[in-house]
């Protein structure tokens, strides 16, 4: 029976590792594409097939290559894995139609299994959309996402629960990053050895990633830098980045969203057409890099590692973590109420009486009930003042239940009061 699978997700998220597990455990042909064009990639795939079959030949077209594989699949089970297929899509506009024709006229009645993968998420999702050549052709597809805080913590089980939140806030849930963390060392020691020290594995990761994906690294870097340092509205980002054109900035942002670096967040209850939106740096390592490293490049060159960390990062790390803590708390609620949650997100509005913007960390509809949560990454337990503050924020909303998340617990713990230990006790 023919199968056509599509595996996609941002770079470093573990697609190739998963495909190589299939290659290792099953009778498979594996080929990694590059951006050197159709002919080069055809020659490369031909060589891989020839080695697999143990015969010496080349094919003049993908049609002839798959004709041969279809014949072989009548007597043996064959899985063909084409990794980073989006490189081919970038360099050849016809490859989607070529593949469609091969599937429709050669593979549908064969026993061949074909799996393609891609790191350019937007390109894959566009290729699968209505009226595109590959629409409706896949028998299975899987988007690989970075781990959430809970799954990421399995890479550093020996860390305290507070440090698990800190590790996630800096390194996120991309397996390539989390796999490098040494949980016998502190967060500070890992940041120094993995990011700050000369020759550290992630010292140039952000710029390398951008150079692989975009042409104008400097402009994209300025946009990410603006967001990481507080600009969240389109106008603000356009001005602070120096692009000074919201239309152009919007196009840059769209690609950064596609790459999984930036996200567009809508206020709770708003539709996807709403203008009540903000932009945030989604990838934690990117956010850390542009918050602490990029804008202090000169100091990093002059100072030694310990002095740089103590001067630039140490005092502000927990402030940095507090923002990510809200995301961790949202993901906790998604896990805890996975079967009954209807909507969850940050909520902001303008209070006309106070003449200022009000933000609620988490609003949630679960099992037809409305909830509001306050998240505090502070060294003090949550007490009356913070609870009273949230009550005032939602005073205009009827039938709402309140809850709290705290790094250091509560003066009085009620049913919907969660501390850091609760986050990892699911």
Predicted regions and their residues:
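A cross-kingdom feature that marks ATP-driven nucleic-acid transaction machinery
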Residues: 268, 276-426
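Phosphate-binding site recognition
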Residues: 1-306, 310-311
């Amino acid at each position: 029976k023919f199968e056509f699978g599509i595996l996609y997700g941002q770079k470093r998220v573990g697609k190739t590792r998963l495909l190589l597990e299939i290659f290792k455990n099953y009778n498979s042909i594996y080929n990694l594409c590059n951006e050197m064009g159709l002919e080069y990639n055809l020659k490369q795939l031909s060589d891989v097939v020839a080695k697999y079959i143990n015969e010496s030949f080349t094919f003049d077209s993908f049609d002839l290559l798959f004709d041969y594989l279809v014949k072989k699949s009548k007597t043996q089970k064959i899985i063909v894995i084409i990794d980073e297929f989006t490189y081919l899509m970038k360099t050849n506009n016809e490859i989607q139609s070529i593949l469609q024709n091969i599937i429709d006229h050669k593979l549908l009645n064969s026993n061949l299994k074909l799996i393609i993968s891609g790191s350019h998420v937007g390109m894959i999702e566009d290729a699968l959309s209505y009226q595109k050549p590959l629409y409706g052709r896949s028998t299975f597809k899987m988007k690989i996402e970075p781990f959430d805080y809970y799954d990421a913590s399995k890479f550093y089980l020996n860390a305290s629960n507070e440090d698990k939140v800190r590790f996630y806030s800096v390194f996120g849930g991309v397996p390539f990053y989390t796999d490098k963390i040494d949980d016998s060392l502190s967060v500070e020691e890992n940041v120094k050895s993995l990011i700050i020290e000369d020759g550290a594995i992630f010292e140039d990761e952000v710029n390398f990633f951008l150079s692989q994906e975009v042409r104008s690294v400097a402009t994209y870097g300025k946009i990410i830098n603006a967001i990481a340092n507080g600009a969240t509205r389109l106008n603000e980002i356009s001005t602070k980045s120096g692009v000074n054109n919201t239309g152009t900035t919007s196009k840059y942002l769209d690609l950064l969203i596609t790459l999984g670096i930036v996200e567009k967040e809508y206020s709770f209850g708003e539709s996807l057409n709403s203008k009540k939106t903000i932009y945030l740096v989604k990838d934690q390592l990117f956010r850390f890099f542009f918050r602490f490293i990029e804008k202090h490049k000169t100091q990093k060159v002059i100072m030694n590692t310990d002095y740089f960390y103590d001067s630039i990062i140490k005092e502000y790390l927990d402030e940095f973590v507090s923002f990510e803590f809200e995301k961790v708390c949202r993901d906790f609620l998604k896990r805890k109420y996975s079967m009954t949650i209807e909507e969850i997100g940050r909520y902001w509005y303008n209070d006309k009486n106070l003449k200022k913007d009000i933000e609620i960390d988490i609003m949630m509809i679960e099992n037809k009930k409305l909830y509001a949560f306050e998240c505090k990454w502070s060294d003090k337990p949550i007490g009356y003042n913070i609870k009273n503050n949230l009550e005032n924020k939602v005073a205009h909303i009827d039938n709402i239940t309140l809850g709290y998340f705290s790094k250091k617990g509560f003066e009085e713990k009620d049913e919907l009061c969660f501390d850091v230990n609760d986050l990892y006790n699911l």
